[in-house]
Amino acid sequence: MLIAGGAVLALIGATTAGCLASTGRFPGDSMDIAWQTPPDGNKSEQGNGAWLVGDLLVRSRFDAATAYDARTGEQVWDHRPPGRSRICAAEADVDRSVLLVVRDDENRPASSRRETCTVVTAVDMENGREIWRTPIPTDTAAESGRRFERSLIAAGGGLALVADQGLRAVDVRTGESRWTAAVPGNCVPGKAAPAERHVAVLLACGAPDKPRTDGEVPEGAELHAAAFAPTTGALLWSTPLGDREPVRWDELSSIVSADPLVVSASGAGDKASGAYYSFDKDGVPRPRIDFSGDHGHLNDRLRVAVVDDTRLYALAGYYVKGGTRHRAVAFDLTTGRQVWRTDLDDLPGVALHLQDGKVTVIVKGSATSAVPDEDLYVLDAATGKERDSRSFHDAVAPAGEVFAYEDLLIVARPGASSVPAFTAYARA
């Protein structure tokens, strides 16, 4: 009887293990939903930012900025623009708990299709209340074909940068004017990212003797990275991105990190070319990190990279017989050389998070799988060695941002749709 009972128990155990294996549900190696916010509903407009500030998660989209308790997912406050106005863009100075939202005219006619982002409003991220507001002068020459793409607003280091005819800084908590940047006469400012040490800005700079209208990019302009003093707006340094070959001003570019200053740039429509360019505190260029190399090809469709004081971490694909494989890669910013690389899976990583010496990667599941099969990898930032790997019980919608809060991993969705704005996962 004991033997028969043991056989039954063994059969039950084997059957249970088989079911768990088919779904990836083993005790101690999975991620379960702890809480999620209510879905936004089916709407085509996309969100424009998500942040973790203290114990609050804040998400901005076209119709409102909303905060949720990071412990429970419960709504804490909701800030809505007045009248018919819509939020065009949003940035945050998390250290000062200030959210900056750019909106259009609240009195625009219902028939108007043109979105003019003319007002910046500062919102206290602790309670959702408006602190101050200021107009953004309308750029009457914005339809020109030679305009450098700018940040409507940027925040950080206690400053709010407003893109008007130059580059103007105000105090992020009070809105009081601080300075207007001393941009060289042959340059036009573009995207900006303020930090405590300096204000990082992309410049389109041409020959000083080339004629141009105010705000228009000079003939023959190339892309520069520049740093301005956060207290005065004085130019600290300006360095061209290219070493032997200049980088054109109209290449696809962005500031990956303000300090250390790291910039990505690639030719429009060219998936293979491009690189990350980094600079030391004095503006001396470091060796570039190419998108393509021995590490494979850094994701061109979903450019995912994070930076700490000394390294850049990214996701790459590489080709082998039978298909594409994927890995996480770390590069030394000083030398541009690969420090480590760790193979992930046959499927690409879709989100990357760096915190407390750990690199967290969410790996996309198969579109043809009958069950959710997204995976989570936690790697040691120093060595790339795997610290933890788990499977999600539920499908993970495309992630815009990933946050680690206490023992939760929180995924923010980039747009307004039928999926929740935030979902928190706990290790099970």
Residue ranges: model-predicted function:
Residues 40-54, 82-96, 102, 135-153, ...:
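Repeated scaffold domains used in trafficking and secretory/extracellular systems
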Residues 74, 78-228, 234:
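Long, acidic/polar, low-complexity amphipathic helices and coiled-coil-like
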Residues 1-10:
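N-terminal export and membrane-targeting signals
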Residues 298-381:
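Loop/turn-rich, solvent-exposed surfaces of beta-rich toroidal or solenoidal domains
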Residues 3, 16-89, 121-124, 129-141, ...:
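Aromatic (tryptophan-biased) beta-strands that constitute blades/sheets of beta-rich domains
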